[in-house]
């Protein structure tokens, strides 16, 4: 596991129930703070998440910046602060444009593309002008690559391509190299949504229970 990446807690491999301990184990203080903000967001503490995220919006480290922008976008949406959320979206778009024109590294460009999709697809915004995320996903670290599979599946789901979305999720889970609880919860939930639309109610229920068992621990 590399802690020096975008959304380090999502990227972290750990057993369900060990999120707080995982955050405490990060050695770099800044990435630990971002991981703590992720923990706050995923445990329903949007205000606490927002306080941390805001401090890193202008970071010169693209991984810290994109992490903070994403957390800022979604925590502010949760808090009903639309204007602040739009500010985070603009920061992501501007950073992606810079990396597209003058990439600092292949990894940083991939991180920027991923952030662009994560901030757009999950809000049902257009991705027509973004680079193809599937071309960059291979450069992402394992835990983020798994979450990118969820984002790609979500795109297919929004197009009504339920079978394709289901296949993406199942393949991602099959070939994962470790336990990544956050990504796995999202993937199982997407599987449940696809199975519901495919009229497979029992399979949808089974997928939801898998997500629940990961989350409740």
Language-model region placement:
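C-terminal non-catalytic interaction modules
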Residues: 1-18, 164, 179-180, 188, ...
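Residue signature of alpha-solenoid helical repeat architecture, marking inter-repeat boundaries
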Residues: 27, 63, 106-107, 143, ...
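Tandem amphipathic alpha-helical repeat scaffolds
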Residues: 2-15, 30-45, 66-82, 107-125, ...
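Amphipathic alpha-helical segments of tetratricopeptide repeats
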Residues: 17-24, 50-60, 90-103, 130-141, ...
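Domain-scale selection of a single, long terminal region
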Residues: 172-173, 192, 204
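A compositional/structural signature marking long, glycine- and acidic/polar-rich segments
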Residues: 140-145, 150, 156-186
């Amino acid at each position: 596991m590399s802690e020096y990446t975008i959304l380090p807690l999502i990227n972290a491999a750990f057993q369900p129930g060990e999120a707080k301990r995982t955050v405490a184990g990060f050695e770099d203080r800044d990435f630990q703070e971002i991981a703590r903000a992720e923990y706050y967001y995923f445990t329903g503490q949007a205000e606490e998440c927002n306080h941390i995220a805001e401090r890193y919006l202008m970071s010169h480290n693209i991984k810290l910046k994109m992490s903070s922008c994403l957390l800022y976008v979604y925590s502010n949406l949760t808090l009903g602060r639309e204007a602040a959320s739009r500010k985070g979206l603009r920061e992501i778009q501007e950073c992606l444009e810079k990396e597209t024109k003058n990439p600092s590294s292949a990894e940083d460009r991939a991180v920027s593309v991923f952030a662009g999709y994560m901030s757009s697809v999950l809000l049902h915004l257009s991705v027509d002008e973004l680079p193809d995320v599937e071309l960059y996903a291979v450069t992402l670290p394992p835990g983020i690559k798994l979450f990118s599979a969820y984002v790609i599946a979500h795109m297919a789901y929004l197009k009504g391509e339920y079978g394709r979305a289901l296949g993406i999720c199942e393949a991602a889970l099959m070939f994962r190299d470790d336990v990544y609880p956050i990504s796995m919860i999202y993937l199982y939930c997407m599987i449940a949504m696809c199975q519901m639309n495919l009229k497979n109610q029992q399979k949808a229920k089974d997928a939801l229970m898998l997500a629940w068992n990961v989350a409740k621990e």
